């Protein structure tokens, strides 16, 4: 049996000024689903990075389109960001990027590639497909209230 989910799909011009619309939409969807504030902030950064990569690299001189699909599941939000522009080899790029090295001078930091590292760090799962264009599938799981062994929820609130 296929897992039930709701789908929201959007298409926007691949221009920097439209990335904020996607961030706001994602925040609204995540809030409705019950995500914690910190998780929503992480997802906003990740989706911004994915969209900005498309704006900067996918279409060169042409103005293309970004397709965004939100898959709303009971326990997670899946976000697909796709373009039909110029692709690149993610494995090659991934091998060249990594965490910030505190021993390296700032002027030696790479200008590109940190966005994918950020996405990978902030999301619970990431898959990248590059055939015709690039598709980034990011997943964030909802962190529900933790339950102790006796079945009582753990709370940070005092009861008076």
Curated annotation (Swiss-Prot):
InterPro entries with a match to the protein in the record: Anti-sigma-factor_SerPK (IPR050267), HATPase_C_sf (IPR036890), RsbW (IPR010193)
GO molecular function: ATP binding; protein serine kinase activity; protein serine/threonine kinase activity; sigma factor antagonist activity
Record has Kinase as a keyword: yes
Keywords on record: ATP-binding, Kinase, Nucleotide-binding, Serine/threonine-protein kinase, Transferase
The protein's Enzyme Commission number: 2.7.11.1
Reactions performed catalytically: L-seryl-[protein] + ATP = O-phospho-L-seryl-[protein] + ADP + H(+); L-threonyl-[protein] + ATP = O-phospho-L-threonyl-[protein] + ADP + H(+)
CDD domains for this protein: HATPase_RsbW-like
NCBIfam families the record matches: PRK04069.1, rsbW_low_gc
Described purpose of this protein according to its UniProt entry: Negative regulator of sigma-B activity. Phosphorylates and inactivates its specific antagonist protein, RsbV. Upon phosphorylation of RsbV, RsbW is released and binds to sigma-B, thereby blocking its ability to form an RNA polymerase holoenzyme (E-sigma-B).
Family: Belongs to the anti-sigma-factor family.
Protein name as it appears in the record: Serine-protein kinase RsbW
Source organism phylogeny: Bacteria, Bacillati, Bacillota, Bacilli, Bacillales
């Amino acid at each position: 049996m296929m897992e039930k989910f709701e789908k929201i799909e959007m298409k926007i011009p691949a221009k920097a000024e439209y990335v904020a619309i996607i961030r706001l939409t994602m925040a609204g969807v995540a809030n409705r689903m019950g995500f914690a504030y910190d998780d929503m902030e992480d997802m906003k950064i990740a989706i911004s990075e994915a969209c900005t990569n498309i704006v900067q690299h996918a279409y060169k001189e042409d103005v293309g389109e970004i397709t965004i699909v939100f898959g709303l599941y009971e326990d997670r939000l899946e976000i697909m960001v796709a373009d039909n522009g110029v692709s690149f080899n993610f494995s090659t790029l991934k091998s060249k990027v990594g965490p910030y090295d505190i021993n390296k001078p700032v002027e030696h930091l790479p200008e590109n590639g940190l966005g994918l590292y950020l996405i990978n760090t902030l999301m619970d799962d990431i898959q990248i497909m590059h055939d015709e264009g690039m598709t980034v599938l990011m997943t964030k799981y909802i962190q529900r209230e933790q339950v102790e062994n006796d079945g009582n929820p753990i709370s940070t609130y005092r009861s008076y």
